[in-house]
């Protein structure tokens, strides 16, 4: 029975996946089927434990779970014994002096020394400290912070076989490492087990293992060894007689280190008998093919949890005895051919958690592994399974293919696996289960197919799997119960949850007579009728949660005699009458979150132990037949319903856990829990309980030491009147017949008294806060209640409310807020608190409160009180609190507070007090708090009153917001008092003095009330007490006495200078914004450049990406070229060739006054990546960074600053950086660009043919200009159709140049006109030349390059000369031919050179042509008068060419 109850504690279904790597994982159970049934499939258990290797090695005694902290000297042991041979020593640390006293371990064979983990101090191990322990066989040192293990540290332990040393130095610090020496293990010839784990080791010294020739187990886990060579196997040169170190080693654990690679030289081949190698949890990313060479005895290798991407061929070739290979959790994406070749003894291969694909797992991967039992390929990237993949794995029993992307499995793929009993194909992409998929799996007992895309299950798919016991088809796309299940007569658990099954009939589970667990959660099942489960006689767990079930027919489960647990939660059930009453075996029933309205205990079977009906609409826990002995429910969850009342019959007597929270319970019947002897917990929080009596929570007597039942009552609107005072004391009751309230801090009370907060936490209430209202009350011993003048009769005054506590020790009379002018009559004589605030009492008459000897608190604040008569508070001997604040009191004469010897708190703030006589406070011997702030007091010797009347009893005083005098004598005394009583004075920051302002004199202080407008407030410095009095506090003005009039001009000059400095600082700080504003609004460029080169072809050249051409043409260029004033802008992808060379780009920048870069992500990825553009920009800006303007996108700032070539420009202050997102973008851009207001000049080019007379120059073209083509026409949109057909002009060598070539053929919307020569036919021109040029380049196989657009400019830059010299540079095209042509060239006039340059270069477009012709003709006219013959010999170079060549 206990086992069954454990099965019923879970809600969700989970089929346990059996894994050979975790053999201790439990079989699927009934809790997994809610459940599931019990699995009985026999599995092969492969042990990963190597205790057989250590069977002859005694182990050190374990450390106690909670060892006592050692006390006393550091080296003094706190001994504990486990038997006669095992000893445990606990101490703080090991010190060299005095030596470690091990007398308590004499004769023992096992010793554990554990240092305190709380002391991070270095321990020192003396040499031969264990020499006296001749019989010791096992030694363990734990948590001792050793930094060195000296030579011969264990001398004398000749019989020691096991040594475990764990310093945990990494907890001390990353640099605290344990240093070993070659002879640290000297004398331990019998040592077989050495554990050096968790020591923060960096390396093992050479020859460290030489003294321990019989060592079999070496543990180096959790250290910081980074290279395999640092483990000391490579250079183990032991002397003669020492034997071969490591020859007997069988187990090596180097996991959890920092190894990155393993080469063939790490020396592990010396370990001939090594059987187990653990290198897991390192940083291995590379292995040598000879890393495991020589390990012929190796049986287990663990390389899991590393970073291996591939493995070398022949890695395991020398280890034919391998049994297990663990390669999980790496980054393997391929396996070399023959990796497992001839490993015929291999039993386990784990390749899970890698990146293997089906292209690298084929029929040769596992060939020859005929003894393989476990194969784990889970969490990889397999997409298909070939029918030959597992062709030789005849003895395979467990195959895990979980979490791949397998979408296709060939027929008969598992046919060779006739011993397979566990197959996991979960979390793949299978769509169909065909008839031949599981052929050959005759002994398959567990099949997992959840989380696929299965929608079709063919009828004969399981015909060869008749022994299947566990089947998981959850989370697929099934629409019905597969008919193929009828072949599984031995099936015990079936999971069909999370599918789309709508209905099933009486034949759906035919032949499943052994089925014990059925899971159908989260489907679309409708109603349940008789016969649906009739073929499941052994069904014990049924999960139908999260469906659409509205009704269950009576008798639907009559054939299921063994049904023990049912889940029907989250359905639409409205009635369960007669459905479950006959299920005598039912123990667990979940009906939560349905639509149940009616519930009765007659609906459930008598043996039910666990019932969940929360989240319904149940209004009462009915028990019509008053069943108590017949009900055995122990856990009942009826929360989140509509229950309004509970009583003794609502709760079974066997109940242990009761959850009825979040209901509408407003009444708990008395003794509702008395008969519940096993009650442990009741949740009643979040209900509607307002009143609760102590007897209503009474429980059955609980005998100690059994704990009291736990009740939770928070979240109820309790009205904490005088009947609820027990709630604070319930946990302190000693009768043990009441529960323990566990959430006392969460209980809140609705207070019946209107004073204070309406809702207060229970923990903050006092006993006198639990009050009940009354109108009239007469005590039992009072005999005068029938008479009018009866002092013992409690009658509440009219228009007042009165309250009392449980024992009438507190009597509150609240007459506040009535605005009455008369004190209430017949206030009860036993009143303890009286509220008279918020009324209108101009005068408090004498003897107004006579006879109220129990009055403790009186509130007369805010009642317009202007005077208090003599003996008003007479006979109030118990009064402790008196509130007179917010009234109109002006003077206290000294008799007001007589006989108030018990008064502790007096509130006089916010009145109009100007005078308080010294005797006023004398009777207040017990005063602890007084407030006189917010009045009109001028002088009050409060320090004398304090010393005379209060002494040390006064704890709080408030003096602020008065009109204290600034007279020297008074002010010194006041400031000294405040400074000396800083802990008592609560409002020192509000204390100030009032002095007469200038012109009024000291007479203003004589009547401060009438002259308040002529006073000025002055702050007081309480840190300068005792200082000499000055006229500052005497009433004079500062200007009259403090500052001489002669200093006024100097002060004015200083202020003017300060103002000027502030203005200059602001102008300097915002100088850039000011410049831009002045330029944008008035056209004034302040502090601009002294000289701006105006004789330039363009104002700016704009470098941008071709992808940004639309924005550049339609926005930037349009705004700049059409604005006022218009600018001449050269666009890179409009006015230059698309593949412009370095020289073309360089010249374009040199004839422009500014270089503008549109810095976008497209520009960085395209244009800036070109070497020609970067080189041109650098050359053009060399020494002139102010010429650069950068328009940058905000999102590319980080990428731009990451560019090492672009960063200097971005960090230079002379460069203009403008963000496109700046709201003053256009103003800043125009300010950064040069502006020349246009001057009208005459145009030398007209349409009249008579005005032009050009000579035709015939001469061979320069060889350096052969490979040039004209630029494309300058246009932005498709509307510019003129000149689109212009083609490059090419001039062959020695060809004559016609005069027509002096003019551009590339035009824009407005082409540049040229004159027509005499005899020239219209339409003739360069067409023939173009054809000739095309033939020339086609004949020579050459592509004509772009023509330089500025070669026709006759200016200071000498473009033709520059180009000639550039072409003569090494690597320039045509350099040698150019030099020869220049030597052979004779002198010609400048005009003739100009025509030659125009013929060779061509033009850019209309704008370039017009500007070029204008400059050419102007310069021609100037040069005709003074010809300047120049020898074009290559010896003279332009200034820019010389600078470039330098």
UniProtKB/Swiss-Prot annotation:
Its main location: membrane. Keywords: Cell membrane, Developmental protein, Disulfide bond, Immunity, Innate immunity, Leucine-rich repeat, Membrane, NAD, Receptor, Repeat, Signal, Transmembrane, Transmembrane helix. The chain crosses the membrane at residues 1050-1070. The keyword Membrane applies. Residues 1096-1233 form the TIR domain. LRR repeats lie at residues 133-156, 158-180, 188-211, 213-235, 246-270, 271-294, 295-318, 320-342, 344-368, 369-392, 393-416, 417-440, 442-464, 465-488, 489-511, 513-535, 536-559, 561-582, 584-605, 606-629, 631-652, 653-675, 677-699, 828-851, 852-875, 876-899, 900-923, 925-947, 951-979. Residues 716-773 form the LRRCT domain. Residues 1071-1446 are cytoplasmic. Belongs to the Toll-like receptor family. Toll-related receptor which binds to the neurotrophins NT1 and spz5. Essential for antiviral autophagy, it detects and binds to the vesicular stomatitis virus (vsv) following infection. This role is likely to be independent of the canonical Toll, immune deficiency, and JAK-STAT signaling pathways. Functions in olfactory circuit assembly by promoting synaptic partner matching between olfactory receptor neurons (ORN) axons and projection neurons (PN) dendrites partners in the antennal lobe. This is Toll-like receptor 7. It comes from Drosophila melanogaster. The gene is Toll-7.
């Amino acid at each position: 029975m206990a086992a069954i109850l454990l099965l019923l504690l879970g809600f969700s279904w989970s089929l346990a996946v059996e894994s050979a790597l975790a053999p201790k994982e439990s079989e699927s159970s009934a809790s997994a089927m809610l459940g599931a049934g019990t699995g009985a499939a026999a599995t092969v258990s492969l042990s990963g434990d190597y205790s057989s290797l250590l069977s002859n090695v005694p182990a050190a005694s374990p450390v106690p779970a909670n060892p006592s902290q050692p006390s006393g000297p550091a080296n003094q042991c706190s001994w504990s014994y486990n038997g006669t041979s095992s000893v445990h020593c606990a101490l703080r640390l090991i010190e060299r002096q005095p030596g470690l006293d091990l007398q308590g371990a004499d004769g023992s064979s096992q010793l554990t020394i554990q240092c305190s983990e709380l002391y991070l101090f270095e321990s020192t191990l003396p040499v031969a400290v264990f020499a006296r322990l001749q019989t010791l066989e096992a030694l363990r040192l734990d948590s001792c912070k050793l930094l060195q293990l000296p030579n011969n540290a264990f001398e004398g332990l000749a019989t020691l076989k096991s040594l475990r040393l764990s310093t945990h130095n990494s907890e001390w610090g990353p640099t605290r490492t344990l240093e070993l020496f070659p002879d640290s293990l000297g004398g331990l010839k019998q040592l077989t087990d050495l554990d050096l784990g968790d020591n923060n080791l960096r390396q093992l010294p050479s020859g460290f293992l030489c003294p321990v020739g019989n060592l079999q187990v070496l543990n180096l886990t959790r250290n910081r060894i980074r290279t395999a060579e640092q483990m000391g196997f490579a250079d183990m040169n032991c002397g003669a007689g020492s034997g071969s170190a490591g020859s007997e080693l069988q187990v090596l654990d180097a996991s959890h280190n920092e190894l990155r690679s393993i080469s063939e030289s790490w020396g592990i081949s010396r370990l001939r008998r090594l059987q187990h190698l653990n290198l897991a949890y390192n940083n291995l990313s590379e292995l040598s093919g000879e890393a495991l060479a020589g390990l012929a005895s190796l049986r287990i290798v663990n390389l899991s949890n590393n970073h291996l991407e591939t493995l070398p061929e022949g890695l395991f070739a020398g280890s034919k005895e391998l049994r297990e290979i663990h390669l999980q959790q790496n980054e393997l994406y391929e396996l070399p051919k023959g990796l497992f070749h001839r490993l015929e003894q291999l039993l386990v291969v784990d390749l899970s958690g890698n990146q293997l694909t089906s292209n690298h797992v084929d029929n040769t991967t596992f060939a020859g592994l005929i003894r393989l039992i476990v194969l784990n390929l889970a969490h990889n990237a397999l997409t298909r399974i070939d029918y030959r993949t597992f062709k030789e794995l005849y003895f395979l029993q467990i195959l895990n293919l979980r979490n791949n992307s397998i979408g296709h499995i060939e027929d008969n793929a598992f046919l060779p696996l006739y011993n397979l009993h566990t197959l996991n194909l979960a979390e793949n992409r299978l769509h169909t289960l065909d008839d031949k998929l599981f052929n050959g799996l005759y002994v398959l007992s567990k099949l997992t197919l959840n989380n696929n895309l299965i929608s079709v299950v063919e009828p004969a798919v399981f015909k060869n799997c008749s022994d299947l016991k566990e089947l998981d088809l959850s989370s697929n796309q099934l629409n019905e119960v597969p008919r193929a299940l009828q072949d599984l007569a031995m099936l015990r658990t079936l999971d069909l949850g999370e599918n789309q099954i709508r209905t099933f009939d009486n034949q759906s589970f035919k032949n499943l007579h052994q089925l014990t667990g059925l899971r159908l959660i989260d489907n679309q099942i409708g109603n349940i009728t008789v016969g649906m489960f009739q073929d499941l006689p052994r069904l014990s767990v049924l999960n139908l949660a999260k469906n659409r079930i509205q009704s269950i027919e009576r008798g639907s489960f009559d054939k299921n005699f063994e049904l023990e647990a049912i889940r029907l939660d989250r359905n639409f059930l409205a009635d369960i009458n007669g459905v479950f009453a006959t299920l005598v075996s039912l123990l667990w029933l979940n009906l939560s979150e349905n639509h149940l309205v009616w519930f009765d205990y007659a609906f459930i079977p008598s043996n039910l132990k666990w019932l969940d009906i929360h989240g319904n609409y149940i209004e009462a826990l009915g028990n019509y037949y008053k069943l108590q002995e017949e009900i055995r429910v122990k856990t009942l969850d009826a929360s989140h319903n509509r229950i309004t009342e509970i009583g003794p019959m609502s709760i079974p007597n066997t109940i242990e856990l009761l959850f009825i929270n979040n209901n509408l319970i407003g009444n708990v019947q008395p003794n509702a829990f008395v008969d519940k002897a096993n009650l442990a917990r009741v949740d009643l929080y979040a209900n509607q309980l307002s009143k609760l009596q102590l007897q209503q929570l009474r429980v059955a007597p609980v005998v100690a030491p059994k704990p009291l039942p736990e009740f939770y009552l928070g979240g109820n609107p309790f009205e904490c009147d005088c009947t609820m005072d027990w709630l604070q004391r319930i946990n302190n009751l000693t009768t043990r017949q009441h529960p323990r309230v566990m959430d006392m801090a969460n209980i809140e009370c609705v207070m019946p008294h209107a004073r204070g907060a309406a809702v207060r936490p229970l923990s903050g209430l006092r006993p006198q806060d639990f009050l009940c209202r009354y109108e009239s009350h007469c005590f039992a011993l009072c005999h005068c209640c029938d008479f009018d003048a009866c002092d013992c009769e409690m009658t509440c005054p009219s228009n007042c409310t009165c309250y009392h506590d449980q024992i009438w020790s507190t009597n509150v009379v609240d007459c506040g807020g009535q605005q009455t002018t008369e004190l209430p009559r017949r206030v009860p004589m036993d009143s303890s608190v009286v509220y008279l605030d918020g009324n209108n009492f101009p005068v408090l008459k004498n003897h107004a409160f006579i006879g109220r000897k129990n009055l403790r608190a009186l509130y007369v604040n805010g009642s317009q009180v202007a005077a208090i008569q003599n003996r008003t508070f007479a006979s109030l001997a118990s009064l402790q609190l008196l509130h007179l604040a917010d009234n109109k009191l002006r003077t206290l004469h000294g008799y007001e507070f007589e006989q108030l010897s018990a008064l502790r708190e007096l509130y006089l703030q916010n009145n109009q007090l100007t005078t308080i006589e010294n005797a006023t406070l004398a009777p207040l011997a017990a005063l602890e708090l007084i407030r006189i702030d917010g009045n009109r007091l001028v002088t009050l010797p409060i320090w004398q009153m304090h010393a005379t009347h209060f002494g040390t009893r006064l704890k709080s005083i408030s003096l602020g917001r008065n009109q204290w005098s600034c007279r020297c004598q008074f002010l010194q005394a006041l400031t000294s008092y405040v400074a000396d009583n800083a802990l008592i004075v609560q409002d020192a920051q509000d204390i100030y003095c009032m002095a007469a302002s200038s012109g009024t004199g000291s007479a203003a202080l004589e009547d401060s009330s009438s002259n308040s407008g002529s006073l000025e407030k002055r702050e007081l410095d309480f840190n300068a007490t005792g200082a000499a009095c000055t006229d500052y506090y005497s009433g004079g003005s500062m200007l009259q006495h403090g500052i001489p009039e002669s200093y006024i001009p100097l002060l004015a000059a200083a202020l003017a200078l300060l103002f000027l400095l502030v203005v200059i600082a602001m102008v300097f700080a915002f100088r850039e914004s000011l410049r831009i504003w002045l330029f944008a609004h008035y056209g004034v460029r302040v502090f601009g450049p002294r000289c701006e080169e105006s004789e330039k072809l363009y104002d700016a050249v704009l470098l941008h990406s071709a992808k940004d051409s639309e924005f550049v043409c339609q926005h930037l260029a349009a705004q700049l070229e059409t604005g006022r004033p218009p600018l001449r802008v050269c666009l890179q992808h409009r006015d230059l060739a698309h593949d412009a060379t370095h020289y073309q780009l360089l010249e374009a920048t040199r004839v422009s006054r500014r270089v503008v870069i549109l810095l976008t992500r497209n520009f960085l990825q395209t244009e800036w990546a070109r070497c020609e553009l970067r080189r041109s920009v650098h050359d053009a800006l060399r020494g002139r960074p102010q010429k650069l303007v950068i328009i940058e996108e905000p999102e590319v700032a980080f990428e731009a600053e990451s560019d090492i070539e672009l960063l200097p420009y971005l960090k230079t202050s002379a460069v203009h950086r403008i963000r496109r997102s700046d709201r003053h973008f256009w103003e800043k851009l125009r300010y950064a660009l040069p502006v020349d207001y246009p001057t009208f000049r005459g145009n030398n080019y007209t349409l009249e043919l008579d005005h032009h007379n050009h000579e035709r120059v015939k001469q061979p073209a320069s060889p350096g200009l052969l490979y040039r083509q004209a630029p494309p026409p300058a246009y932005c949109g498709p509307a510019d159709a003129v000149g689109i057909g212009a083609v490059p002009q090419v001039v062959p060598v020695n060809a004559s140049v016609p005069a027509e070539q002096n003019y551009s053929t590339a035009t824009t919307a407005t082409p540049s006109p040229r004159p027509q020569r005499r005899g020239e036919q219209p339409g003739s021109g360069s067409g023939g030349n173009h054809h000739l040029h095309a033939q020339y380049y086609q004949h020579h196989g050459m592509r004509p390059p772009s023509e330089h657009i500025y070669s026709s400019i006759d200016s200071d830059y000498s473009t033709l000369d520059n180009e000639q010299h550039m072409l003569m540079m090494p690597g320039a095209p045509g350099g040698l031919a150019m030099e020869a042509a220049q030597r052979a060239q004779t002198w010609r006039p400048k005009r003739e050179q100009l025509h030659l340059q125009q013929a060779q270069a061509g033009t850019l477009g209309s704008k370039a042509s017009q500007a070029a012709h204008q400059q050419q003709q102007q310069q021609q006219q100037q040069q005709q008068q003074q010809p300047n013959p120049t020898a074009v010999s290559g010896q003279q170079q332009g200034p820019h060419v010389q600078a470039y060549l330098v």
